[in-house]
């Protein structure tokens, strides 16, 4: 009887998710200290520290990528102090949350606990450990992944909460980095259009639009509080990166000559 209770406890989804969460954090904490990319590894350390000291991106210094990662890092520095460990913990916590979300996606599709545990563990090893430290590409890709998870759950479970969360995660992905989030967002809207037309589920659009509007309003209010003008946001986040991309595309030549 006792062994059965122990077995039931350690095979419970809640216990397994907590186990994966802790393991994912420890894995990233370990590998983040094994080495560092000089350029990328500290990409958000200085911006996070500057925000903590009252210097804000877009207003006080120029950026060409999203700013969400910098603000999140500033929050970690505020809560845990300015140190290497608190810097890495940002990425580790994100790794843990993503791993748990992945586990529940597997379980949602009725994959047995053993395989869900193994696949989620492999995910935790490969997800944020390739960088170890907070990085805009990873945040953008993984916020996009959470958005895709919400789309899957919204269609499968037909719960309005997931439609509400969908634009929020995509908004955070875009504000982390414009690419790859833009490609994921456009692809998702294409899938969503097909779903709405075929299934006649027009109600979901209401929740998506309301959530999107609230998210945009919050961002505008936050920017106003920070003294960031809309013009600076559009120039640095939208227009200038777009001009870089257009120049690269214009110079691209498709040839079979190598």
Model regions and ranges:
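Transmembrane-helix signature of polytopic, membrane-embedded enzymes
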Residues: 97, 102-125, 160
């Amino acid at each position: 009887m006792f062994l059965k209770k122990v077995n039931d406890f350690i095979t419970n989804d809640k216990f397994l998710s907590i186990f994966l969460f802790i393991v994912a954090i420890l894995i990233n904490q370990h590998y983040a200290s094994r080495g560092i990319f000089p350029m990328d590894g500290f990409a958000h350390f200085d911006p996070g520290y500057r925000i903590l000291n009252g210097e804000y991106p877009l207003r006080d210094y120029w950026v060409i990528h999203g700013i969400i990662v910098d603000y999140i890092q500033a929050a970690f520095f505020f809560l845990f102090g300015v140190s290497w460990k608190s810097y890495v913990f940002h990425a580790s916590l994100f790794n843990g949350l993503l791993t748990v979300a992945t586990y529940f996606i597997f379980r949602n599709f009725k994959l047995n606990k053993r395989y869900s545990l193994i696949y989620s563990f492999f995910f935790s090893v490969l997800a944020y450990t390739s960088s170890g430290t907070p990085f805009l590409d990873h945040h953008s890709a993984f916020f996009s992944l959470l958005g895709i998870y919400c789309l899957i759950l919204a269609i499968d479970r037909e719960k309005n909460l997931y439609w509400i969360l969908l634009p929020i995660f995509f908004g955070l992905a875009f504000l982390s980095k414009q690419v790859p989030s833009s490609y994921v967002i456009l692809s998702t809207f294409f899938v969503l259009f097909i779903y709405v037309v075929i299934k006649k589920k027009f109600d979901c659009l209401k929740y998506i639009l309301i959530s999107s509007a609230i998210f945009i309003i919050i961002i505008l209010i936050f920017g106003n509080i920070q003294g960031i003008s809309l013009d600076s946001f559009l120039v640095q986040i939208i227009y200038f990166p777009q001009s870089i991309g257009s120049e690269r595309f214009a110079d691209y030549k498709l040839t079979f000559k190598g």
